[in-house]
């Protein structure tokens, strides 16, 4: 059942018109990631796309302006992931700074309320005195919730980035770059990015109406909230296109300079990350999971409270609570992975090979962790995966992750068309989606999903591969180049961190921490001795003292320990030669 991993080198677009002063290595890396001109490398706020191109913004800011003037009770309804938490906190903080005092927030509980603006969540908002609801990172599929709000005379502004269905909810205003009639050039804004753009537009409208002058309020600097935008954008794994790179870089720069929310500072502390050396990967792999742990296992209100609090002492208490939840999440996930691999073995034995698309269910799985499980199994077997857990009412909740070549939401939409009623509801993106179905429909869904993936996907796309930026010359294997690469980001989804490959002599190898392989290597053609580490190796294969030469796929990195800096390579894949 071991997945064979192939190595492929990226193609470089030789027609890219990049600045001549860029180092040749960076020109190569940028050109192979679709960057075609200098303006796509802009990282200052002046390079941001203008909010005026987002459809629905003018209507939304007019509604909000009138709500501000009349003292209307505004309830922000968020989502229970990191994007939803940052969107919620940003919207509340921004509107407070803009002069709104009658504002509160509500985050649906994953286990009691489910996703989005449901009628039940509307009732909760109504009980809190809502006179206007603003959704963030949800709402585009909340037809019933919006209708229920209308029946209670509560207008709704929907801000979302998820893909819309054929019909839209009957909200007073909808802001979503993925609307069919929206001309916003970037379709990759996270929910927190959409919320930030709405707040920029609202600030401009309020200024033009004389709002700040009338009340003697200083016009707020909304750039102070870009730390939240960066965290939500990276944690939600949206593509880091040119506009998202600006938002992320600006937010990271504020965090590095110590100009961030106390909650983010506290998360960095519990994750043992130095703010001054922050990388985008720290947001995705250290802060994001801790924030997400609240929504996965408990209640995301803890995460939002952390991001909203102004006191570092209070923030540290909440961050430690999230850190403990994340540790529990890891333990739950580890057990679920073992069970999932057992299910894969059974599937393979019964069918001679794994299906092209995997739908998996275990009655003891935790619905807050199935998304991570789907990601892990997808990475291991390189095929679309949907993992289900019981919702406790005779239904299952599933979370899916896809690979390049299969649009997950489109696949679910096709299944819904072919087999009406098989799913209760679904939604999502190209690479991730969520759905629910009745428990007795699981086996049918498992079969139909596998068949659809087999029909839609070329078998070659199910072959695991590592995509490399090619070799580094010995002269490029230096601390200076490693620092250059670190500073050339932010790297992330659809703009991956540089990965190189090469042929090396394996001089030393030993296990550290049970499953990590520590090595010393030297380029076969001559070059510097390099320390390297490969994480979570197959200990049945490594170390192998009979192997003298290896092909490596690796990242050039700087190891910082007790004030000392040294060059090292992080090995993604190792092949004996």
Feature map (PLM): residue ranges:
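A residue-level signal for conserved active-site and pocket-lining positions in enzyme catalytic cores
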Residues: 30, 134, 292, 485, ...
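A short acidic, amphipathic alpha-helical/loop segment
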Residues: 144-148, 373, 480
């Amino acid at each position: 059942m071991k997945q064979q991993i192939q190595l492929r080198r990226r193609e470089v677009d030789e027609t890219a018109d990049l600045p001549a002063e860029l180092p040749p290595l960076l020109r190569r890396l940028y050109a192979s990631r679709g960057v075609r001109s200098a303006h796509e490398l802009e990282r200052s706020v002046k390079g941001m796309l203008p909010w005026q191109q987002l459809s629905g913004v003018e209507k939304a800011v007019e509604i909000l302006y009138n709500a501000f003037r009349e003292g209307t009770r505004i309830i922000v309804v968020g989502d229970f992931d990191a994007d939803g938490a940052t969107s919620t906190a940003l919207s509340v903080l921004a509107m407070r700074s803009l002069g709104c005092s009658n504002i509160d927030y509500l985050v649906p509980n994953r286990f009691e309320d489910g996703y989005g603006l449901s009628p039940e969540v509307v009732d909760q908002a109504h009980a809190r005195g809502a006179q206007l609801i603003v959704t963030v990172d949800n709402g585009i599929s909340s037809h019933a919730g919006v209708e229920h709000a209308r029946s209670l005379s509560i207008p709704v502004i929907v801000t979302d980035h998820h893909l819309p269905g054929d019909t839209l909810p009957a909200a007073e205003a909808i802001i979503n770059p993925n609307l069919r009639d929206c001309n916003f050039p970037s379709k990759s804004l996270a929910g927190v990015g959409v919320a930030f753009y709405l707040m920029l537009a609202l600030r401009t409208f309020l200024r033009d109406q004389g709002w700040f002058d009338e009340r003697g309020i200083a016009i707020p600097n909304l750039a102070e909230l870009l730390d939240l935008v960066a965290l939500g954008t990276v944690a939600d794994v949206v593509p880091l296109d040119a506009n998202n790179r600006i938002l992320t870089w600006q937010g990271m720069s504020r965090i590095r300079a110590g100009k961030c929310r106390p909650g983010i500072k506290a998360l960095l502390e519990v994750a043992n990350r130095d703010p001054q050396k922050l990388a985008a990967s720290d947001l995705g792999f250290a802060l994001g999971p801790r924030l997400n742990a609240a929504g996965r296992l408990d209640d995301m209100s803890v995460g939002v409270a952390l991001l909203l609090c102004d006191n570092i002492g209070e923030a540290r208490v909440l961050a430690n609570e999230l850190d403990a939840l994340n540790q529990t999440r890891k333990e739950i996930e580890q057990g679920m992975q073992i069970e999932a691999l057992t299910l894969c073995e059974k599937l393979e034995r019964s069918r001679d090979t794994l299906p092209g698309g995997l739908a998996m269910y275990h009655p003891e799985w935790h619905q807050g962790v199935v998304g991570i499980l789907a990601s892990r199994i997808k990475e291991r077997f390189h095929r679309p995966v949907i993992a289900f857990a019981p919702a406790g009412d005779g239904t299952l909740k599933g979370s899916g992750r896809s690979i390049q070549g299969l649009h997950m939401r489109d696949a679910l939409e096709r299944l819904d068309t072919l087999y009406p009623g098989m799913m209760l509801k679904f939604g999502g993106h190209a690479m991730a989606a969520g759905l629910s179905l009745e428990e007795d429909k699981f086996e049918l869904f498992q079969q139909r999903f596998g068949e659809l993936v087999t029909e839609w996907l070329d078998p070659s796309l199910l072959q695991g591969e590592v995509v490399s930026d090619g070799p580094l010359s010995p002269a490029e294997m230096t601390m200076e180049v490693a620092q250059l690469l670190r500073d050339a980001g932010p790297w992330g989804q659809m703009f991956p961190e540089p990965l190189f490959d090469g042929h090396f002599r394996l001089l030393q190898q030993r296990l550290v921490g049970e499953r990590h392989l520590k090595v010393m290597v030297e380029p076969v053609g001559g070059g510097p001795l390099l320390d390297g580490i490969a994480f979570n190796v197959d200990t049945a294969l490594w170390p192998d003292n009979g192997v003298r030469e290896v092909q490596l796929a690796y990242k050039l990195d700087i190891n910082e320990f007790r004030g000392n800096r040294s060059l090292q390579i992080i090995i993604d894949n190792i092949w004996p030669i």
